[in-house]
Every structure is written in C-alpha cells, then in structure tokens.
Curated annotation (Swiss-Prot):
Organism placement in taxonomy: Eukaryota, Metazoa, Chordata, Craniata, Vertebrata
UniProt GO cellular component terms: cytosol; PML body; transcription repressor complex
Gene name per UniProt: SP3
Protein name: Transcription factor Sp3
InterPro entries: Znf_C2H2_sf (IPR036236), Znf_C2H2_type (IPR013087)
Motif (9aaTAD): 451-459
UniProt region (Transactivation domain (Gln-rich)), positions on chain: 129-228, 341-489
Organism expressing this protein natively: Gallus gallus
Length: 771
C-alpha cells in the first residue's frame, strides 16, 4: 500500500538533527518487534559545506546543543541550487540481537561511488545498512530514497508514506479510523513494536490515547495495528491490517441510534401506577407471555397507563429480542456470538433490496479486512422492519424491569431499570457490543403467510456510539376486541336464556381501540306451541330465508289405540290456502269457459256438477274446482308449490303432491295398518296392503260393515262406492280391521243407525280413494 511518487522541494529537505537524549550509545532492537525508523538525506551545498557542519557536530562527545542544531538546519535550508546525489539510506532492524551504535562520525562510500558522511548517532550494520536512532525521528514523516535517485530535478523516487487507505462512505463522507495508542505516546512503541502512522492533512485519525467518552462517532480497534506489505528501507513487514470504517448497513424506516450512558428514570417523572408486562423467550427465540390475562374491569380503570416490558431468559436460550418500540427501549448488552433478533411477526413486508443510494445516513461501524475485496450488506425488505411490536399484558405487577442476556458460559449480563418506562420518556437505545462477531436477524411475514428471517453479520465491533432509534409514524395497530358476547342457551324447560360472556380487552398505549356492541341472542330460536305439555306441538322455526313454519301434527304419529272416540272431518285438502282451525274455506265459482257457457252445470242437470277441461284434445272431467285448477296448471306448466327442504327445491302443481314429497324428506309414515301396525307414507300403499290381509282371510264383501257417523253438514258421507274413509264398528264383538263382525243378533241396519259407535281410523285422505 504505497502512495504515488510526489516531488519534494529542495528547501523542504532539511538535514535531520541528531538527538542523543544524553546518551553516547544507542541500542537497536532486533528480535522481530523492532520498530522501523526513517532517514532522510539533506542536499549538499557548497557554501557553507554541510559535511563540515556534520563533522563539527559529530566531533563532540555529548549531544549537540540547540544552537548548533538550529545553525545546521539553517545552513542546510539555504543550500538551494546545489546538486548532490542521495545514497540509498534504508531503515531496517537486525533480527535477534542488539547492536551497540557508536557516536563517532563515519564516512563511507555507497555503490555509486559517492562519499556519504554518517552522523555520530548512526552506524553501519553488517548488512551494509544505515541505522539512525529513533529519538531523532520524532514528529517526522517517514520516507526512503532509492539508490540512483537524483534530487536536482525536484523529484524523489520510490517515496512511500501514508499507508492508510483513503476510504469514503456511500454518501461521500470521510472515513474515520481509530487505532490503539502506544503506552508512551511516542511514534514507535518499543514493547509491542507497533508502527504509528502519521496522518495526512485530509484525514482524521485518533492515533493515541484510550477511547475517550468525549469523542463521539469514533470506533476504537483494540490490538496491534499491522500494516500489510509496507516496504520501509528495503525491508517488509507482512501482516494483515484491520481497517475500521463506517459501513452503511441500511436500516430502513429512518432508524438511527443515539448513545445513552445511563437512564435516570427518577428525573423522567414516571408514575407509580403503571402496568407491567411480563414476557419471556422460549428455546426457539420467540417472545412468549408468562403472565395471566387481565379482565375488562381492570382495563377500564387503567386506561392511559403505560406498559413496561420485562424480558426474562430461559436456561438454554442464547438469543435475545431487543424491543424496538418507544415504550420498550432499554440498554442491552450483547456478547459475541450472540444473536440480536427483531420480532416482527405482526408486520407484513414486501421482499426487495435496499441500495446504498436509498440510505439516509444510517451507519453501523464495522471492521473490514484488507484481504476482503467487497462486502455487500443488503436488506431484503423494502418496508421498515421495525415499526410497532405487539406487547402482551400481564396482571402481575413487578417493581423492576430487567433485561438479561444469555451467554454460552451461562453468564448473565443484566441492565437494571426502574419499575416503569413511558414511551414519551425513552427515545434512545444503547447497544454495547463486546469484540467479536454477532448476527442481526429480522423476522418478517410475507403476504402469503410464510415467515422469513433476514440475517446480517457484523464482525469486529466493540462499541456502538451515537445510535438512535426513531419509530416510523405510520401504521398504528388497531384492536377490535369484543367486550361482551351474549350466547343463547336452552334451559331444561325449553326456555331460551341469555348468558353474557365477558372477554378481556387489552388496553395498550398508542393503540386505537374499536368497541363492538353486544350481540343479541339470535340464530337458534325455539317457539313453543299452545300445548306446552305435548312434544308434538313444538314448532321449529328455521333460519332465514325460509319463513314457513312446520307443525308436526300429533295425530300423524299416534297409534290406532289412541284413536277412540275420534270425530273424523274430511275437508278439501286441494285448496290453495292451508286449513286453519276456526276458518272455513269459501267455495270459489269456476271460471272455466265450459262452466260459464253452461251456466255452472254440466249437460245433465240432475247429476253432480262436473268441471270439464276446456283445453282442446283433453276433455277431462273433475268434480271439484280445485282439481280442475290443478289440472289447468299442469297444462300451463305452472308449479307454484316449491319444496323448501335444504338443497331440494323441487316444484309441484298441487299441494298434496308437495306434502307427499315432504314425507320423503322427513321419513314420516302417517298411514298405519290396523292388522300388523305397519306404516306407509301414502294411503294407496296402505290400501293395497290391507287387501293382502283380506285375501288371506277370505273376506267377502257381504260381511264388510260400512258405517257413517253423524251425517251433518260439515261431515262428508261415506258410502260403499268409491269412499275415502272406511270406518269399522268396534263396539260389539272383536273386530280386527275390516273384517267379520259378530253381532249376536244385531242386524247391519241397527249398527248403521247407532250414532254413538266409536270409530277406528283406517285411512285419511281428501282426494284419494281406495281401489
């Protein structure tokens, strides 16, 4: 690492004074730690002669007086215009021995044949090198003159000086370098052999003294400073130089650091009633909550209070989360080989790359080796990594918040703080790092839900000063807690009761809280029927959009033994409106063309009224208007009756078809056989089943008893031809279904005239007849 050759003026090259410091003999250390000194040859002048001045100076036994030194320097400075060749004066140490240098002057001849007079303080070693005492080279620049150089033309070849590289940061700022100082504040340390390089005019180098607390933004490198490949006087000192420089790391979100020597919490005016968060770090390096959740009653009284975090350590954990929000900034001590992690689980960032041009003066001081060409430190998150950290609250208060940090030897370095810290009080963070290598890991969550870790490695950092964390003003965390949720529960008696469930809400500082009102009891509702004692009268109301209520009738599930003293009323089930108790269906005049033209009757006036379909080619005849209307809907394709069962949606032209279809969903079998108690969904299926019993017993039609009950205006007469309801006499004798009745002297006419006969229901249908 040499600088380019620069011309040296003759008036700037003065003769070096010899300072013997009161000694006539000098020691040269040569055990490998010998420090290199420099020598310069003064240009010769004819008037007065510099050799005469040197001979007069060296003839004295003691050190030269200050007056003589000044005279010699003045004489050398006025010797402009004279020409002379400088010999190859080289500085080197003889290894593994001490040499005694005599103070007598010497005159030797170099390789070019020039006569050079050596001062009394210097000597010639066995290798033919000139050695000058180190006391005479204080506060002088070190350079060497190669053999055969000519100073008359104003140039000096192979001048090597200032081996510190010129390093600048990304924004053009000057690099600040620091080196460990020698013990005696001299240019060369005799004990450690360190070479102290004199800085140039455009560099700022702290060359001596321990790192002072008054010097800001300076990083001191401990240990020996070795210059690699520096040639001084023909000798080389190989080694690797640790150059400490300011390298921009690229902390996003305008994050800077400012040092804090001590945190005086008493002068910050902190309150005594603040909440305390108790958190811990598990073995995986995640922040966990070790306290219990606070209920809503305590949160209402502690509105506006601050949160003080407390981070504890597990037995096997060497990782540390450094809190970065304004309410959790405390001094932290980080050991070498420890991992500094940022918990950003609550943030979603977009992967990207931050270039050096986007950095805004945020630096972390690192050490870069000479053998390392370039170290690109990249941050793969375009958005700020640290903005707001979600904190868990704990109900248990603590008097002190302590941050501890785990080390491989299970040694704990802790920094104590007082009982609470407000976010307005602490705005700074101090990171004290021991020498070594440490990692910075930032955890981010991608939009797809994957957790990624970004790792940054920094080597050789001993101390970080002038660092300040400033939180980004955007992206406040919004909490939407549910304060009270009312759940509906069904009691044993069927009543719906509301049970409020209280949920705790976290009152965190600087967070907007959105309150959700209480939810009323809705969803499942049980509607009680008129007769609460009968489970068959319970109506189940389905959720929207199904507004129709289903009623499970009790007579559809009763056995035949429960049908004694039953009054049977046959109604028109084909009507458009369902039957409601206490209301009668009004008959509507038929509006078909045949009924209007024929005056409402068929061709035969004495017979029952008939309704003939007026569609050409059909000609079907119906005895009821409802049947004709249903038939006309079949012609037009209109199907107004829709099954509202889930995922069904079938449509029908007649209501009885819809009711029959519903029984396929519910599995209801309302038609019961009186012989074997089998159940059927349809009445025609039951009629066919009854015929099987009749055929087995050989029942003839003459032994069948048909009866009618109370032939009133509201009841329909039941006859033997094409009737819809079959009644059997069960008063006298034993009757099994429709069978032979043993009346013991009672005629069939007497049975028919008896109006108090208990009846047994065999089949119920308004429009279906038995075959």
């Amino acid at each position: 690492m040499t600088a380019p050759e620069q011309p040296v003026k003759q008036e700037e090259m003065a003769a070096l004074d010899v300072d013997s410091s009161g000694h006539g003999e000098y020691l040269q250390h040569g055990n490998g730690n010998a420090s290199a000194s420099a020598a310069a040859a003064a240009p010769q002048d004819a008037q007065p002669s510099p050799l005469a001045l040197l001979a007069a100076t060296c003839s004295k036994i003691g050190p030269p007086s200050p007056e003589e030194d000044e005279a010699a320097a003045a004489a050398a400075s006025h010797s402009a215009g004279a020409t002379g060749d400088l010999a190859s004066v080289q500085l080197a140490g003889t290894p593994n021995r001490w040499e005694v240098l005599s103070a007598a002057p010497a005159t030797i001849k170099d390789e070019a044949g020039n006569i050079v007079q050596i001062p009394g303080a210097a000597t010639v070693t066995s290798s033919g090198q000139y050695v000058l005492p180190i006391q005479s080279l204080q506060n002088q620049q070190i350079f060497s003159v190669a053999p055969g150089s000519d100073s008359s033309n104003g140039t000096v070849s192979n001048v090597q000086y200032q081996v510190i590289p010129q390093i600048q940061t990304a924004d053009g700022q000057q690099v600040q370098l620091g080196f460990a100082a020698s013990s005696d504040n001299s240019s060369i340390n005799q004990e450690t052999g360190q070479i102290q390089i004199i800085p140039g005019s455009n560099q700022t180098i702290i060359a001596s003294g321990s790192p002072s607390a008054n010097i800001q933004n300076i990083l001191s490198q401990s240990g020996q400073v070795q210059v690699q490949g520096v040639a001084i006087g023909g000798s080389s000192f190989p080694g690797q130089a640790q150059v400490v420089a300011n390298v921009p790391l690229g902390l996003p979100g305008n994050i800077t650091f400012v040092p804090i020597n001590s945190v005086d919490l008493d002068s910050l005016g902190l309150g005594s009633g603040s909440q305390t968060m108790t958190a811990g770090i598990n073995a995986d390096g995640h922040l966990i909550n070790t306290g219990q959740a606070m209920d809503s009653s305590d949160n209402s009284e502690r509105t506006g209070e601050q949160v003080s975090p407390e981070i504890t350590e597990t037995a096997t954990d060497n990782d540390l989360f450094v809190p970065t929000s304004s309410s959790s900034q405390l001094p932290v001590t980080i050991d070498s080989s420890s991992i500094l992690e940022q918990n950003a689980n609550n943030l979603t960032t977009t992967s990207g790359q931050v270039h050096s041009s986007d950095l805004q003066g945020n630096y972390i001081q690192t050490s870069v080796s000479d053998d390392t060409q370039a170290q690109n430190i990249q941050v793969s998150t375009a958005q700020p990594i640290v903005q707001h950290i979600q904190l868990q609250e704990s109900q248990q208060p603590t008097s002190q918040a302590q941050i501890v940090q785990g080390i491989a030897q299970q040694t704990i370095h802790g920094v104590q703080a007082s009982q609470s810290i407000s976010p307005q009080a602490l705005q700074n963070l101090q990171l004290q790092l021991n020498p070594g290598t440490f990692l910075i890991q930032a955890q981010t969550v991608t939009p797809s839900g994957q957790i990624t870790w970004q790792t940054f490695q920094v080597q050789g950092v001993q101390n970080l000063q002038n660092l300040q964390i400033q939180n980004a003003p955007g992206q406040q965390i919004t909490l939407t807690p549910v304060q009270t949720l009312t759940l509906g529960q069904v009691a044993a008696g069927g009543a719906l009761t509301s049970t409020p469930v209280s949920l705790s809400t976290a009152q965190l500082p600087n967070l907007q809280t959105v309150t959700v009102n209480s939810i009323d009891s809705a969803g499942i509702q049980l509607h009680q029927g008129e007769n609460a004692g009968s489970p068959a009268d319970i109506r189940i109301k389905e959720e929207e959009p199904d507004p129709e209520e289903w009623q499970l009738s009790g007579d559809s599930t009763l056995n035949t033994n429960d049908l004694t003293h039953l009054r049977v009323q046959v109604v028109d089930e084909e009507g458009d409106q369902p039957h409601q108790e206490g209301k009668r269906l009004r008959r509507v005049a038929c509006t078909c063309p045949n009924c209007k033209e024929g005056g409402g009757r068929g061709s035969n006036l004495g017979k029952k009224k008939q309704h003939i379909c007026h569609i050409p080619g059909c000609g079907k005849v119906y005895g009821k208007t409802s049947h004709l209307r249903a038939h006309l809907r079949w012609h037009s394709g209109e199907r107004p009756f829709v099954c509202n069962w889930m995922f069904c949606g079938k449509r029908f032209t007649r209501s009885d078809e819809l009711q029959r279809h519903r029984r396929t969903h519910t599995g209801e079998k309302k038609f019961v056989c009186p012989e074997c108690s089998k159940r059927f969904m349809r009445s025609d299926h039951l009629a066919k089943h009854i015929k099987t019993h009749q055929n087995k017993k050989g029942i003839h039609s003459s032994s069948t008893v048909l009866a009618s009950v109370e032939a009133t205006s509201d009841d329909t007469l039941i006859t033997a031809g094409g009737t819809t309801l079959i009644l059997a006499n069960i008063q006298q004798g034993s009757v099994s279904g429709i069978g032979t009745v043993n009346t013991s002297g009672t005629s069939n006419q007497d049975i028919l005239t008896n109006t108090e006969i208990p009846l047994q229901l065999v089949t119920v249908s308004g429009n279906e007849t038995m075959e």
